Amino acid sequence: MKPIKEGKVREIYDNGDSLIMVATDRISCFDVILKNIISKKGTVLTQMSKFWFDLTEDIVPNHMISADVKDMPEFFQQPAYDGNSMMCRKLTMLPIECIVRGYITGSGWASYQKNGTVCGIKLPEGLQESDKLPEPIYTPSTKAEIGDHDENISFEQSVDVLEKEFPGKGKEYAEKLRDYTIALYKKCADYALKKGIIIADTKFEFGLDENGNIVLGDEMLTPDSSRFWPAKGYEPGHGQPSFDKQFARDWLKENEGNHDWELPEDVAKKTIDKYLEAYELLTGEKLK
């Protein structure tokens, strides 16, 4: 079988009335696919998404049908697809990346230092890097093609983007995306904190099912789509150690111009070790 779509990390196969989404062991940073293959990474992404989808189906329906290859066509019943594949409902994806920030870090911190705002949202004075925000903030962005960068937009602009594609529905969809995003973040951040992990920020993607209902799609709260920090030793005032690909990003930044988009073996190994540690802390299980 050949995928109908290949993303930076995922391959999507058409399965008639459903899709099979395979998370590969590729890693991308700064919208570039690195040369490394990070063993087990795809399985962590798929199994972590499954865990969160199960935990949050009371808030919003999601696209997962099954993460068991026994439920999938014979082609997927081989070791290369076991654990990293998910059968999903077909959705019409909405053209917005739904980003939620509970802590000030990364590009949000850089923006706040300049003008006291993050994506146009005014924040209290006197915040330090990595501070918890009084309330999580919703900062949507556009979806970029591979090689391009997503662009931050205001809530009002997200209404316009959705209205253009779904006339008469822009405001309704934008409000639902915002409300679902905040509700999902709050529930999962509370859960994660009890397990020793701070979810600093994350992104969700949503689509419409055949009846026009909003459904959570793509991946959910993985180390690829989120910033995970250890709660132990958390201290505002500087950057935090992380359980996500920030470790790989930091190495690339520090070695700019000298890496040709490839991580040294020890950095690649440390990256997957962090992914596995996050998975085990959050789910209470070792990855099979």
Q: Where is each model-derived feature located?
A:
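Active-site loop/lid in soluble adenylation, ligation, and acyl-transfer enzymes
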Residues: 1-145, 258-288
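Coil-to-beta-strand transition motifs
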Residues: 18, 93-95, 196-199, 211-214
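Intrinsically disordered, low-complexity acidic/polar segments
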Residues: 30, 109-110, 211, 225-227
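Surface-exposed helix-capping loop/turn segments at secondary-structure junctions
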Residues: 58-63, 187-199, 212, 283-288
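Conserved metal-phosphate-binding beta-hairpin within the catalytic cores
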Residues: 100, 199-220
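Anionic ligand-binding catalytic core segments
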Residues: 114-115, 123-172, 216, 220-282
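A long amphipathic alpha-helix within ATP-dependent nucleotide-binding catalytic cores
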Residues: 166-200
